[in-house]
Amino acid sequence: MCRRCERKRSPGTGARNYEHRHSSPACDLSELRSSHGALKIASGKSDGNLFVKRSSVFYWLLGIVIATVAVATAFYFDTAVSAFLVQHRNRVLYNFTYYVTLFGDWPEHFALGLILAWVARRRGNQKWKRIFLSMVIALAIAGVSAHVIKIGVSRARPSVKLERVEPWSRFSSHYHAFPSGHVAASTAFFGVLMLASWRIGLACLPIVILIAFSRLYLEAHYLSDVVCAAILGILSALLVVHFFLRPIRHPQSAIEN
Protein backbone atom coordinates (compact mmCIF):
# COMPACT_ATOMS: atom_id res chain seq x y z
CA MET A 1 0.00 0.00 0.00
CA CYS A 2 1.40 3.41 -0.90
CA ARG A 3 1.70 6.35 1.46
CA ARG A 4 -1.30 8.07 -0.07
CA CYS A 5 -3.54 5.19 1.00
CA GLU A 6 -4.84 5.04 4.57
CA ARG A 7 -6.31 2.19 6.58
CA LYS A 8 -9.71 2.72 8.15
CA ARG A 9 -11.46 0.48 10.71
CA SER A 10 -15.21 0.11 10.12
CA PRO A 11 -17.24 0.74 13.30
CA GLY A 12 -18.90 -2.16 15.11
CA THR A 13 -17.48 -5.03 13.05
CA GLY A 14 -13.79 -5.12 13.98
CA ALA A 15 -12.89 -5.91 10.36
CA ARG A 16 -10.43 -3.73 8.51
CA ASN A 17 -11.39 -2.16 5.25
CA TYR A 18 -8.93 -0.29 3.05
CA GLU A 19 -9.92 2.87 1.33
CA HIS A 20 -7.93 4.78 -1.24
CA ARG A 21 -8.25 8.48 -0.61
CA HIS A 22 -6.00 9.28 -3.51
CA SER A 23 -6.64 6.91 -6.38
CA SER A 24 -4.14 7.58 -9.18
CA PRO A 25 -2.11 5.65 -11.79
CA ALA A 26 1.08 6.30 -9.79
CA CYS A 27 -0.52 4.80 -6.68
CA ASP A 28 -1.66 1.69 -8.55
CA LEU A 29 1.78 1.25 -10.14
CA SER A 30 3.49 1.50 -6.75
CA GLU A 31 1.19 -1.13 -5.29
CA LEU A 32 1.71 -3.41 -8.30
CA ARG A 33 5.50 -3.23 -7.99
CA SER A 34 5.33 -4.00 -4.26
CA SER A 35 3.15 -7.06 -4.80
CA HIS A 36 5.35 -8.23 -7.69
CA GLY A 37 8.46 -7.99 -5.51
CA ALA A 38 6.75 -9.93 -2.74
CA LEU A 39 5.81 -12.68 -5.18
CA LYS A 40 9.42 -12.95 -6.41
CA ILE A 41 10.72 -13.22 -2.85
CA ALA A 42 8.11 -15.81 -1.95
CA SER A 43 8.94 -17.93 -4.99
CA GLY A 44 12.70 -17.65 -4.42
CA LYS A 45 13.35 -16.01 -7.78
CA SER A 46 15.00 -12.75 -8.65
CA ASP A 47 16.39 -10.90 -11.63
CA GLY A 48 19.72 -10.42 -9.95
CA ASN A 49 23.00 -12.11 -9.39
CA LEU A 50 23.85 -15.29 -11.24
CA PHE A 51 26.10 -16.40 -8.41
CA VAL A 52 23.74 -15.92 -5.44
CA LYS A 53 20.31 -16.61 -6.93
CA ARG A 54 18.61 -19.48 -5.12
CA SER A 55 17.51 -21.19 -8.29
CA SER A 56 21.13 -21.43 -9.49
CA VAL A 57 22.52 -23.10 -6.35
CA PHE A 58 21.46 -26.55 -7.54
CA TYR A 59 23.17 -26.06 -10.91
CA TRP A 60 26.37 -24.85 -9.26
CA LEU A 61 26.44 -27.91 -6.99
CA LEU A 62 25.73 -30.17 -9.96
CA GLY A 63 28.51 -28.50 -11.92
CA ILE A 64 30.97 -29.00 -9.05
CA VAL A 65 30.10 -32.70 -8.84
CA ILE A 66 30.44 -33.19 -12.61
CA ALA A 67 33.75 -31.29 -12.69
CA THR A 68 35.15 -33.33 -9.78
CA VAL A 69 34.22 -36.63 -11.42
CA ALA A 70 35.61 -35.48 -14.78
CA VAL A 71 38.95 -34.38 -13.28
CA ALA A 72 39.34 -37.58 -11.24
CA THR A 73 38.55 -39.72 -14.28
CA ALA A 74 40.97 -37.75 -16.46
CA PHE A 75 43.85 -38.18 -14.01
CA TYR A 76 43.14 -41.90 -13.83
CA PHE A 77 43.32 -42.35 -17.63
CA ASP A 78 46.20 -39.90 -18.26
CA THR A 79 48.86 -42.47 -19.11
CA ALA A 80 46.54 -44.82 -20.97
CA VAL A 81 45.16 -42.11 -23.29
CA SER A 82 48.61 -40.72 -24.02
CA ALA A 83 50.02 -44.17 -24.83
CA PHE A 84 47.04 -45.02 -27.06
CA LEU A 85 47.44 -41.86 -29.14
CA VAL A 86 51.17 -42.44 -29.57
CA GLN A 87 50.62 -46.02 -30.75
CA HIS A 88 48.02 -44.97 -33.33
CA ARG A 89 49.78 -41.90 -34.66
CA ASN A 90 50.04 -41.29 -38.41
CA ARG A 91 51.63 -38.56 -40.48
CA VAL A 92 48.43 -37.16 -42.04
CA LEU A 93 46.60 -36.73 -38.76
CA TYR A 94 49.74 -35.38 -37.11
CA ASN A 95 50.06 -32.62 -39.72
CA PHE A 96 46.35 -31.83 -39.45
CA THR A 97 46.45 -31.48 -35.65
CA TYR A 98 49.61 -29.38 -35.94
CA TYR A 99 47.79 -26.72 -37.97
CA VAL A 100 44.72 -26.96 -35.74
CA THR A 101 46.82 -26.23 -32.67
CA LEU A 102 48.36 -23.21 -34.41
CA PHE A 103 44.90 -21.68 -34.77
CA GLY A 104 44.07 -22.57 -31.18
CA ASP A 105 46.74 -20.36 -29.64
CA TRP A 106 45.67 -17.19 -27.85
CA PRO A 107 47.11 -14.59 -30.32
CA GLU A 108 44.87 -15.92 -33.11
CA HIS A 109 41.79 -15.84 -30.88
CA PHE A 110 42.72 -12.37 -29.63
CA ALA A 111 43.10 -11.00 -33.15
CA LEU A 112 39.87 -12.67 -34.29
CA GLY A 113 37.91 -11.17 -31.38
CA LEU A 114 39.22 -7.66 -32.04
CA ILE A 115 38.47 -7.92 -35.77
CA LEU A 116 34.91 -9.10 -35.10
CA ALA A 117 34.40 -6.30 -32.55
CA TRP A 118 35.65 -3.74 -35.10
CA VAL A 119 33.29 -5.10 -37.77
CA ALA A 120 30.35 -4.97 -35.35
CA ARG A 121 31.23 -1.39 -34.44
CA ARG A 122 31.42 -0.37 -38.10
CA ARG A 123 27.98 -1.88 -38.67
CA GLY A 124 26.58 -0.06 -35.64
CA ASN A 125 25.77 -3.26 -33.75
CA GLN A 126 26.63 -2.38 -30.16
CA LYS A 127 25.30 -5.65 -28.77
CA TRP A 128 27.66 -7.86 -30.77
CA LYS A 129 30.53 -5.44 -30.33
CA ARG A 130 30.16 -5.91 -26.59
CA ILE A 131 29.90 -9.69 -26.96
CA PHE A 132 33.08 -9.91 -29.05
CA LEU A 133 34.99 -7.69 -26.62
CA SER A 134 33.76 -9.87 -23.76
CA MET A 135 35.12 -12.90 -25.61
CA VAL A 136 38.53 -11.21 -25.75
CA ILE A 137 38.40 -10.35 -22.04
CA ALA A 138 37.49 -13.93 -21.12
CA LEU A 139 40.34 -15.16 -23.31
CA ALA A 140 42.79 -12.88 -21.49
CA ILE A 141 41.59 -13.95 -18.03
CA ALA A 142 41.81 -17.65 -18.88
CA GLY A 143 45.18 -17.29 -20.60
CA VAL A 144 46.84 -15.36 -17.78
CA SER A 145 45.39 -17.69 -15.14
CA ALA A 146 46.57 -20.77 -17.03
CA HIS A 147 50.09 -19.37 -17.42
CA VAL A 148 50.37 -18.57 -13.71
CA ILE A 149 49.20 -22.08 -12.82
CA LYS A 150 51.67 -23.58 -15.31
CA ILE A 151 54.61 -21.91 -13.56
CA GLY A 152 53.35 -22.92 -10.13
CA VAL A 153 52.66 -26.58 -10.98
CA SER A 154 55.52 -27.15 -13.48
CA ARG A 155 54.17 -30.45 -14.76
CA ALA A 156 56.24 -32.12 -17.48
CA ARG A 157 54.62 -32.65 -20.85
CA PRO A 158 54.03 -36.24 -22.03
CA SER A 159 56.80 -35.85 -24.62
CA VAL A 160 59.43 -34.95 -21.99
CA LYS A 161 61.77 -37.79 -21.00
CA LEU A 162 63.57 -38.14 -17.70
CA GLU A 163 66.96 -37.44 -19.23
CA ARG A 164 65.71 -34.02 -20.38
CA VAL A 165 65.15 -32.64 -16.89
CA GLU A 166 66.42 -29.06 -16.73
CA PRO A 167 67.63 -27.07 -13.71
CA TRP A 168 65.20 -24.21 -14.43
CA SER A 169 62.31 -26.46 -15.39
CA ARG A 170 59.74 -24.23 -13.67
CA PHE A 171 60.23 -21.60 -16.38
CA SER A 172 60.72 -24.00 -19.29
CA SER A 173 57.90 -24.61 -21.76
CA HIS A 174 58.64 -28.34 -21.51
CA TYR A 175 57.21 -28.22 -17.98
CA HIS A 176 54.12 -26.15 -18.67
CA ALA A 177 51.69 -29.00 -19.25
CA PHE A 178 49.11 -28.21 -16.57
CA PRO A 179 46.72 -26.75 -17.58
CA SER A 180 46.51 -26.42 -21.35
CA GLY A 181 46.65 -22.76 -22.32
CA HIS A 182 45.21 -23.47 -25.77
CA VAL A 183 42.16 -25.24 -24.37
CA ALA A 184 41.59 -22.69 -21.60
CA ALA A 185 41.73 -19.81 -24.09
CA SER A 186 39.49 -21.39 -26.72
CA THR A 187 36.95 -22.59 -24.14
CA ALA A 188 36.71 -19.14 -22.57
CA PHE A 189 36.55 -17.44 -25.98
CA PHE A 190 33.79 -19.57 -27.46
CA GLY A 191 32.17 -20.13 -24.06
CA VAL A 192 31.16 -16.47 -23.92
CA LEU A 193 29.74 -16.81 -27.42
CA MET A 194 27.71 -19.86 -26.40
CA LEU A 195 26.33 -18.12 -23.31
CA ALA A 196 25.40 -15.06 -25.38
CA SER A 197 23.97 -17.00 -28.34
CA TRP A 198 23.83 -20.74 -27.78
CA ARG A 199 23.07 -21.60 -31.42
CA ILE A 200 26.17 -19.85 -32.77
CA GLY A 201 28.24 -21.08 -29.85
CA LEU A 202 27.11 -24.66 -30.40
CA ALA A 203 28.16 -24.42 -34.04
CA CYS A 204 31.65 -23.38 -32.88
CA LEU A 205 31.94 -26.19 -30.31
CA PRO A 206 33.74 -28.56 -32.75
CA ILE A 207 36.55 -26.00 -32.95
CA VAL A 208 37.16 -26.29 -29.20
CA ILE A 209 37.02 -30.10 -29.37
CA LEU A 210 39.51 -30.20 -32.26
CA ILE A 211 41.92 -27.91 -30.41
CA ALA A 212 41.71 -30.09 -27.29
CA PHE A 213 42.29 -33.25 -29.33
CA SER A 214 45.26 -31.70 -31.13
CA ARG A 215 46.97 -30.94 -27.82
CA LEU A 216 46.55 -34.56 -26.77
CA TYR A 217 47.63 -35.98 -30.13
CA LEU A 218 50.80 -33.87 -30.27
CA GLU A 219 51.83 -35.07 -26.77
CA ALA A 220 51.69 -31.52 -25.48
CA HIS A 221 49.26 -32.35 -22.67
CA TYR A 222 47.72 -35.16 -20.69
CA LEU A 223 43.98 -35.69 -20.58
CA SER A 224 43.76 -34.09 -17.12
CA ASP A 225 45.54 -30.96 -18.42
CA VAL A 226 42.87 -30.55 -21.08
CA VAL A 227 39.91 -31.23 -18.77
CA CYS A 228 41.11 -28.81 -16.08
CA ALA A 229 41.82 -26.17 -18.73
CA ALA A 230 38.28 -26.53 -20.07
CA ILE A 231 36.90 -26.00 -16.56
CA LEU A 232 39.09 -22.90 -16.16
CA GLY A 233 37.81 -21.56 -19.48
CA ILE A 234 34.18 -22.15 -18.52
CA LEU A 235 34.64 -20.33 -15.21
CA SER A 236 36.30 -17.40 -17.01
CA ALA A 237 33.41 -17.22 -19.49
CA LEU A 238 30.81 -17.27 -16.70
CA LEU A 239 32.66 -14.52 -14.84
CA VAL A 240 32.84 -12.24 -17.87
CA VAL A 241 29.24 -12.86 -18.91
CA HIS A 242 28.05 -12.02 -15.40
CA PHE A 243 29.90 -8.71 -15.15
CA PHE A 244 29.94 -7.50 -18.77
CA LEU A 245 26.92 -9.01 -20.55
CA ARG A 246 24.29 -8.97 -17.81
CA PRO A 247 22.75 -5.62 -18.95
CA ILE A 248 22.29 -7.13 -22.43
CA ARG A 249 20.70 -10.32 -21.14
CA HIS A 250 18.48 -8.53 -18.60
CA PRO A 251 17.73 -5.07 -20.04
CA GLN A 252 14.59 -4.52 -17.95
CA SER A 253 16.32 -5.28 -14.64
CA ALA A 254 19.21 -3.00 -15.62
CA ILE A 255 16.78 -0.11 -16.20
CA GLU A 256 14.96 -0.68 -12.93
CA ASN A 257 18.16 -0.89 -10.93
For each feature predicted by the language model, list its residue ranges:
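Membrane-interface loops
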Residues: 80-83, 125-195, 200
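Cysteine-centered motifs
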Residues: 2-5, 27
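Hydrophobic, aromatic-rich transmembrane alpha-helices
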Residues: 111-120, 186-194
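Membrane-embedded catalytic cores of phosphoryl/pyrophosphoryl-handling enzymes
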Residues: 40, 53-54, 60-61, 165-257
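N-terminal transmembrane-helix/juxtamembrane module of multi-pass inner/ER membrane proteins
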Residues: 37, 44-113, 150-172
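Short, basic, low-complexity termini and linkers enriched in Ser/Thr/Gly/Pro
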Residues: 10-42, 57, 248-257
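Aromatic-anchored segments of alpha-helical transmembrane domains
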Residues: 68-74, 140-145, 208-220
